[in-house]
Regions:
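PRPP-associated nucleotide enzymes
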Residues: 1-200
Length: 200
């Protein structure tokens, strides 16, 4: 059975192949012949860039209002884009099998996927920012500084856009969650490049 995500990546032009002799540098510091823009599964490059702009502006503002600003845009796109909606449904079904208390996602592209999955599961969402600050939004949509959310002893599924060697996990996501006394029990990525990240 063909994986629909592979088809959707090509349908949304999310896969870019490098020019000969000019490999891409990945965030992980590795070189590679192709680049995957998983955020294009949001519907298109244009739609993804628009949401990235909203995310960047919301990150720069009051972080307690971050979730509402970003999720409002995501909700509209879920209604408008069948590929994005079907992807979130697939990810939600995978996450539903995991014994977790909340969903976490990291700035920026993880939010495309972590926020709607948390909402569909009826779980809270931990938004982790690049400065390692975090905001927890409970299942009712109420946001608070994560330190006030009583997450000690809780387990999350961290939902990522893409994993190569899991450098963002090591550098930021795991320390942020563990700093709250919680644990990333599972990780769910749209794409795992199978370059060692799943071993972390």
């Amino acid at each position: 059975m063909e994986n629909p995500i592979v088809s959707w990546l090509f349908e949304t032009d999310a896969v870019r192949v490098c020019p000969e002799g000019q490999p891409f540098w990945y965030t992980s510091g590795k070189l590679g012949p192709f680049y995957i823009n998983t955020q294009f599964l949001y519907g298109s490059e244009e739609a993804a860039n628009a949401l990235l702009t909203v995310i960047e502006q919301a990150c720069a503002g009051d972080k307690l209002r971050f979730y509402d600003k970003v999720y409002g845009e995501i909700e509209k796109q879920l209604a408008a884009c069948p590929i994005y909606r079907q992807l979130i449904d697939l990810m939600t079904e995978a996450a539903r099998k995991m014994d977790v208390d909340f969903v976490s996602g990291g700035e920026r592209r993880d939010f495309f996927f972590s926020m709607p999955v948390a909402r569909k599961l009826g779980l809270g969402h931990l938004s982790i920012f690049k400065d390692l600050s975090s905001v927890y939004t409970d299942a009712n949509g109420v946001s608070m500084p994560a330190g006030q959310a009583s997450l000690s002893g809780k387990r999350s599924v961290h939902i990522a856009d893409l994993v190569t060697v899991a450098s963002s996990y090591i550098r930021a996501w795991i320390p942020a969650v563990e700093g709250l006394g919680a644990k990333i029990a599972y990780s769910l990525a749209v794409v795992d490049r199978d370059q060692g990240g799943s071993d972390i």
